[in-house]
Amino acid sequence: EGRLKDMADCCQTFLEVYGILEDAQGGGAEAVRHALYTAVSDLCPQAVDDRNRELLDPSLSFARDIVMNRDLTDLRYLYLYGDYISDNELDTARYLNQLPQETVTAMAATFTEGYRRGFELAHVDLSKKSLVDVRYCIGFERVIREAVKQFRQMGLEAVIYRFAVHLMNRRGSEKIGYYGTPANAQCDYDHRCDLGLFLDHDLKQRKLDAQRNAYERRRELAAGMAGPAVMEIFGEEAFIPVNKPEAVSYTPYQLKLMSQMQRDSVRITYQYINGEERSFAIISYP
C-alpha cells in the first residue's frame, strides 16, 4: 500500500529493541516490554484510524485496483498484494481462468444476488446504501471482479481491505478482509495473544477513544455501509495447532479487559452503522 511511515515506525521500534538487547545494562525483558508498550500506545490512534478508513473509504483502492485493472491471465498479478502466495492461490487463479465467462458471471451472481435477497427478506431498503464490504481469499479475483461490477449495478461500491496486521486491530489469529494461505500457521497461532504482553486499562481505553473518533470523522461513509459480502473457502489441509508454553497468554484481568474492549467496540460500531439497516452474505468455495 506504500505506507512508508508505518514501515519506518516498525523499523524504529525494532532498532530500539535491538539496542536494548545489545546493551548488557539495557534492562532486559522489562525494558523490551516497556519499549513495545510505548510504541504500540503511541501509534494506537493512528493505527486505529487507518484501519477504520480501510473499512469504510472506497478511495483506498489498492486491492480493488488489482482486481479490476490487472491482467488476471498473468498470474504474476498475485504477487502485487505483497502477501505470501502459495500453490493454493496460484492453482485457484489458474483454474478460474479456465472457466467460461458465463460460469464466472453466474458464480458472482449467486454471491451478489444472495446479498441483495438478504435485504429483501429483512425488509431493508438497499437503495439507501452506497458501500459493500467485500472479503475474499486471494486467488478468486476473477469472480470478485464480476461481483464488484454486479454490486455497482446495485449502486454499491466495493470496499476491499487487507486483513488487520497491527496489534491493536487484530482479533487473535482471525483474518477479516482479503488474505491468502498463511506462510506459517503455527506462527500465527503462537502470536494470537501478543497484546497480552502489555494490555492494560489505559491501552484499552485509548483504542476505544480512537475508534470513536475515527467513526465520527467518517460518519457519512459509515451510514452508507450495507454490510459484509464474504467469500470463504473450505477443504484446506487441516491445521492442528500446538499450544506452546513460550507463547504469550492473557491474564484473567486481561481477559476481562479484552471482553470489555470487544463489547464496547461493537457498541461504537453500531452507533454509526445501524445494525437494523444492514445485511450480509457468505458463500464458500473449495
Protein language model annotation of sequence segments:
Residues E1-P286:
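Active-site bordering "gate/hinge" segments
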